[in-house]
């Protein structure tokens, strides 16, 4: 039965690659800049100064990170659309990079917390460029998954209902982690996933992320991606 299911999914994936060949090449243009205004206003409001050294360090690494995204970003987004069979619903997204304490990266409003990537503000060794790319991809996938499931009956799916007792953090990452794993595997970018998982363990929601990945592995990533293909139906 499992062999049959995998075969059906494989056929569906091939059809998706063909039918969305045009759409998958149209990926959103993603840009990011250090928001000095955000950092200044935030630090003044919270009474938590940011050193000029840290701000200068962030500005120095931005060009390198842009170059890295230009190399890795488009193929991650194209492969996502190809695997799921649904195009990205927006054409552009702009992120504000910041160092102010008290906020974290999020999909909306589009914010990138850079404290762990800057030597003077990271607690220990700064995170790698691979983790930076993974953070952007992660936040974009939140929007993509939400768009795919927008028409789900009663706002849920079979597997979200099955795991309704789990925390919202776990449920909000099931489909995301499924797509993430298939995309990184398809592109042979497993190091990005490995580094991301290590980085996640340092965060307060780390246990919830671990639990979500356990569920995805148990049910298989293809199971959750199929729900995205069907719009949650």
What label would you give each PLM region?
Residues 7-18:
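Bacterial N-terminal signal peptides
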Residues 21-23:
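Boundary at the C-terminal end of the N-terminal hydrophobic targeting segment
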Residues 28, 34-66:
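Acidic/histidine-rich, surface-exposed loop or edge segments in extracytoplasmic proteins
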Residues 52-110, 170, 185-187:
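Auxiliary, metal-adjacent structural segments of Zn-dependent hydrolase domains
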Residues 61-70, 122-126, 159-167:
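Second-shell loop/turn segments in exported
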Residues 94-134, 146:
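Active-site scaffold of zinc-dependent metalloenzymes
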Residues 148-149, 156-204:
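Post-HExxH zinc-binding segment in Zn-dependent metallohydrolases
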Residues 193-233:
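Pan-zinc metallopeptidase signature
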